Amino acid sequence: MVCVACVEENKGCECEHEKPVRELVLEAASENSSFLHSVINMVGMLIGLGQLSMPYAVESGGWMSIFLLISFGILTTYTSHILGKCIRRNPKSKSYSDIGYSAFGRHGRLIVCLFIYLEIFMALVSYTISLHDNISAAFPATFSNHGHFPAAKLTAVAVAIALPSLWIRDLSSISFLSSGGILMSAIIFGSVVYTAIFGGVIDDGKIPVLRLENIPTVSGIYLFSFGGHIVFPNLYTSMKDPSKFTKVSIVSFATVTALYGALAITGAKMFGPSVNSQITLSLPKHLVVTKIALWATVLTPMTKYALEFAPLAIQLERSLPSTMTDRTKLVARGLMGSALLLVILALALTVPYFGYVLSLTGSLVSVTIAVTLPSAFYLKICWDGMTKFTRAANLGFVVLGCVLGVLGSFESSKLLVKELVRVHGG
């Protein structure tokens, strides 16, 4: 990722601090990633919090929304492909923000950086909400007679345990945590499949074919789940044979879409209208696999804080006066990071509505990063070599991204406000 401090440079960000962050995002820092390794990296970047809400999204949008999931999978595969074409047109582009600069100059890079940081912030809020919800479910006896406050206290304790990780400057020592998404996905998928086969769960509730009024918010959840495009240019440049990048995208997105579809259908079929916005919270509490899934979902946010915060921390440190010593910068970075995480904790406890926040993030940020900007970059960089159909299609994708972003953000925000008013009696 690029830092905002380098936005004013007429080149990609090649600062010394950049290498560790890229290594955290992609394990292949050199141009030596095989096809299989690249697929694993891309799948790992795509799979995340979104998988928890797949059954909920189907319940909200109806069974027909599965086709929307598949359509977005195809669309975001295409936008991944055209990011590769943008890099081939300008080989100096090494990152998503470099492509933004190649297309729209300094303003393009600045816009990209702002969206990167906004996505990081909102993702951290979502992770913390997930931590709170699942840690409450992991200790049901503890909170059954004491209301919401004890759960909030334990969430605060969990965040406090993770706070010291924000003070680590060299994150390469914990880069193995970046593979946690794939492990969590395997555990959750295994738990859902086990419950479907052996759990004896039967739900008589009916899910409608289509709920058109919920499509904007459901679209946000689906798009959030396909939004890994920020690191795809780095993955492209790390490949031994970049000409296979499109095939990597097709295999990776097909794998993830199949996983999401299986989770969505299985979870929605088992729990029907009673399904929670996080599938782990709907699994039978007495099953051992449920406890494993809950703890996997609890531990994942705690391991993500340092990794997700790294780009923000780097920018904060670079913004400090050069006269400061390294020790003073480390302390300032740690204090600012801790303060930001406490703000995120407060926000997550104030607005603990995972599904709505995830939908808002997808509509406000992910659709821009995964659909609107890639098509806009492609139009600007490769306009001369496009057919009329390709130009029209990508112009349509830009418009579609803007429409989905506006409608989804409005609907998600409206639902959030409505829920807050209902809960707090305003």
UniProtKB/Swiss-Prot annotation:
Asked if the record carries the keyword Transmembrane, the reply is: yes
Which InterPro entries does the record match to this protein? AA_transpt_TM
Q: Which gene encodes it?
A: AVT1H
Question: What membrane topology does the annotation report for this chain?
Answer: Multi-pass membrane protein
Ranges annotated as spanning the membrane: 34-54, 55-75, 110-130, 148-168, 182-202, 215-235, 248-268, 292-312, 340-360, 363-383, 392-412
User: What is the protein's name according to its record?
Assistant: Amino acid transporter AVT1H
Keyword Transmembrane assigned to the entry: answer is yes
Which Pfam families does this entry report, sorted A to Z? Aa_trans
Example of a GO biological process term: amino acid transport
Q: Name one GO cellular component term.
A: organelle membrane
Annotated source species: Arabidopsis thaliana (Mouse-ear cress)
- Keywords from the UniProt entry: Amino-acid transport, Membrane, Transmembrane, Transmembrane helix, Transport
Intracellular or extracellular location(s):
Membrane
Q: Write out the similarity annotation.
A: Belongs to the amino acid/polyamine transporter 2 family. Amino acid/auxin permease (AAAP) (TC 2.A.18.5) subfamily.
